[in-house]
Amino acid sequence: MTQLVELKEVCLSFDGRSVLDKVSFTLNKGKITTLVGPNGAGKSTLSKLVLGLLTPDSGQITRSRDLRVGYVPQRLYLDPTLPLTVRRFLQLGKNGRLSIEEALNRVGAEDLLDNRMQKLSGGEMQRVLLARALLVKPELLVLDEPVQGVDINGQIELYALISQLAAEFNCAVLMVSHDLHLVMASTHEVICLNRHVCCHGEPESVARHPEFARLFGRPEQEVLAVYTHHHHCDGEHHHHEPQVPVIRLPSRNQ
């Protein structure tokens, strides 16, 4: 398994307040890692460290040379009076027509090309932002709350799409969960963060961990009849109808 990013004992403080304390993990090619934790746990800050937008106070971050990174931000503010179509938005990075159309096709948003950005639904906006991230042909995808503002069916579709793209590009994925109500079954590893790494591992093992239970209570295990995700010995990712186990976490308001 090819390692793309490694964090070792990373610490970061803002105004004398510790935000991250001795955080260590790796991001590997073809592996989906989901970062969960309560508000103020340092999740978005950690993603910015991975992106190189922040520098740690101590510890070490190692990235593979010339790493191509696609990023989907937590939110995108657009002036409502700006006449910006999806086409023009994706052309801002000097991307060509064929590349833009191919990226939109990959995320199932080819019909949105001439729509105004400000008129997109939550799910449509996330697909367009994901298409933009794919234009760099990423080795690493960093997704900060990729299903924010999307209904439950749209969330499931986006999670399945992310899993499909990770397999197609054979890229690493770091996904930040903010609302904490779903962790997709296709995640290879969950990192539970509360300024430090409380626990990590496969979703089922993390859900049973005492530290996870202390932060979130005992999550209810449910089965949603949507799709299943299996990793076969041939290295391929296979989706089958109709069941997927999903760990449902308490929302931050509970």
From Swiss-Prot:
Which key words tag this protein in UniProt? ATP-binding, Cell inner membrane, Cell membrane, Ion transport, Membrane, Nucleotide-binding, Translocase, Transport, Zinc, Zinc transport
Q: Where is the composition biased (Basic and acidic residues)?
A: 233-242
A Pfam family that the UniProt record links to this protein: ABC_tran
Q: What is its EC number?
A: 7.2.2.20
Name all ABC transporter domain ranges. Answer: 5-219
Top-level taxon of the source organism: Bacteria
Cellular component per GO? plasma membrane
Q: Where in the cell is it found?
A: Cell inner membrane
Protein role: Part of the ABC transporter complex ZnuABC involved in zinc import. Responsible for energy coupling to the transport system.
Q: Return the similarity comment.
A: Belongs to the ABC transporter superfamily. Zinc importer (TC 3.A.1.15.5) family.
Quaternary structure note: The complex is composed of two ATP-binding proteins (ZnuC), two transmembrane proteins (ZnuB) and a solute-binding protein (ZnuA).
Q: What name does UniProt use for this protein? A: Zinc import ATP-binding protein ZnuC
Per the UniProt record, the source organism is Aeromonas hydrophila subsp. hydrophila (strain ATCC 7966 / DSM 30187 / BCRC 13018 / CCUG 14551 / JCM 1027 / KCTC 2358 / NCIMB 9240 / NCTC 8049)
